[in-house]
Structures are given as structure tokens and as C-alpha cells.
Amino acid sequence: MSVSGELSVANGKSTPPKSSISDYIALLKPRVMSLVVFTALVGLMVSPVPINPWYGFLAIICIAVGGGGAGALNMWYDADIDAVMERTKKRPIPMGKISPPKAFIFGMVLSLLSVLVMGSFINWFAAFFLAFTIFFYVVIYTIWLKRITPQNIVIGGASGAFPPMIGWAVTTGAVSLDSFLLFLIIFMWTPPHFWALSLFSSLDYEAAGIPMMPNVRGEYSTKKQILFYTVLMVLCATAPCFTGLGGVFYGIFSTILGIIFIYFAYRLWKANTHDETILMAKKTFFFSLLYLAAVFGALLIESLVRYFIDL
């Protein structure tokens, strides 16, 4: 403890920790934002309409800022449960580094700014789509679904699946079947990803009173549904090959990754003991991160190769 902190305690006063730039960055959920930005970038790059690089860069910044604003609003509302969970109790609001009102204002300013800039400089369709995504994540998922149903991340997961459609809308001013397929891949990926996490974090969620699938339906039902959604996800990931969005490289690569993902999900489903379940849940969770990045990365690589071949 610092000298000033000791004097404050001695005088019967506690000095709240000072906030820093890193605390405000933490409010943005940078790890989540990085996935949002990457999938949005892929949606933008694989769309059939070219865009000025500077406008594309500005659009991605808007999506990142909007995603960060939504993350801050999520932390503002979830401050009570974040303080209970081991995984989240060191976030800025539970630690007292940023007050809830400041977090709320920060999140609202970023959210509104991102939408206004997107509409003013890119197009209003993409801006309204971004606004709807922020609303869906904060209101539909965080405020409404998260604390009342084990299907929270199934329905609420749509908010995390919208970014590639926003990226697509940036260049085209519309949505299409191909952009919807990108949405479906992430939408089906979300349950296996988060339910695997909830299997080895079930005590944390239980302490916070969040009705995640393992706490409500049990381990076996959760593992079975992880396998079910994994198969659906892999099928959705092959669909771009039939529309022309994905080529031979993407088709082979995504299929191999999909088989590996199904293998992990199957091993998790067949796990006989709790310890084995936890081990396989962790492996499935971490592979899911690699899978989504690799599948979207393959689409991006193919798009860039086609671009340079056509030059």
C-alpha cells in the first residue's frame, strides 16, 4: 500500500483506485472486439463491391468503436455479477477504478459516435445495422436474456454474428445470401464455444446466478447440444462453396477444420468423468477460437488471391 493509501486508511477514509487509460480500454472488451473487427473485415473484403481503402478503414474503425461501446455498456449493466465471478471480478468497475455512471456515459458516447460517423461517411444502411447490433447485444442479450434463460447465448449470440453482415453492407448498402451465410457460421459457432466455456466455469456462473446450460440442464445435455450445434456449424461452413463465395482452398481447409472440431465435440460428449469433461471442454473451447479465425481467414486469403490475380 502507498503512503497516501495508508494515511487515508488511518484517517478512516478509503481512497478509490485511480482509473487509467488501460482501464477504459478494458471496458471495450478488446479480445471480443478483435474478433468482431476481424469478421467484419472479412465481410467487407469478400463482398463483390470494391471500396476506397480509406472508407473501408473508417468503416472498420466505426465497427470497432461501436463494438467497444457495446462492451462498455455490457460491463456497466453486469457490474454486480462481474464482482462475483472469478473470471471477471478484476474488471475496472468491480475493482472500483471506473464508476458505473462513467462506464455508461463512455459506452453511450462511443456507440452513438460510431453510428453517426458510419452513417455520415459510409452509408446509413450499415449505420442502422450497426446500431441494431449494439441494441441487440446490450438490451436483448445483456439486459433481457442473459439472466433468465439457458438459451441466452443461442439467441443473444446473433449480436456477435452480425459484424460480417455489417462489413458486407458497408460496400454494398445491402445484405445478401452470402453475407447471411457468414452470419450463420458464427451464429452456429457461438453455442459450442460458450457452452464449452460454461462447462469448466459452471461454478462461476452458478455463483453469479446466470442460468448457463450446464447449471440448468446438466453436463450431459450440454455436451450433447455442443455436438449438435458443432455439426450444424460445420455444415453451414461448407455452404459458401456452393454459392461461389468460397473456393477449393476454402472448401478443403474448412472441411478439415470442421472434422477436427466435430472430433473434439464428440470426445467431449463421450467423456465419462467430470475431470475428463472439464479437460475436453477446455480443448474444445480453445480450438473453437482457432477454428473461427482460421475459417474466416481462409475466406480472406482466397479473396485477396482472387483480387491480385484479376489485377
Swiss-Prot record:
Membrane topology, as annotated: Multi-pass membrane protein
User: Which GO MF terms does the UniProt record name?
Assistant: protoheme IX farnesyltransferase activity
Parts of the chain that traverse the membrane: 32-52, 53-73, 104-124, 125-145, 153-173, 180-200, 224-244, 245-265, 285-305
* Pfam families registered for this protein in UniProt: UbiA
Keyword NADP appears in the UniProt entry: no
List the pathway annotation.
Porphyrin-containing compound metabolism; heme O biosynthesis; heme O from protoheme: step 1/1
Q: Which cellular components does GO assign to this protein?
A: plasma membrane
Keywords attached to this entry: Cell inner membrane, Cell membrane, Heme biosynthesis, Membrane, Transferase, Transmembrane, Transmembrane helix
* Subcellular location(s) of the protein: Cell inner membrane
Protein's GO biological process: heme O biosynthetic process
Q: What broad class of enzyme is this?
A: transferase
Q: Which NCBIfam families match?
A: cyoE_ctaB, PRK04375.1-2
The similarity comment for this entry is: Belongs to the UbiA prenyltransferase family. Protoheme IX farnesyltransferase subfamily.
The miscellaneous remark of the record is: Carbon 2 of the heme B porphyrin ring is defined according to the Fischer nomenclature.
Q: What does this protein do?
A: Converts heme B (protoheme IX) to heme O by substitution of the vinyl group on carbon 2 of heme B porphyrin ring with a hydroxyethyl farnesyl side group.
Record-given protein name: Protoheme IX farnesyltransferase
Q: Please report the organism this UniProt entry assigns to the protein.
A: Bartonella tribocorum (strain CIP 105476 / IBS 506)
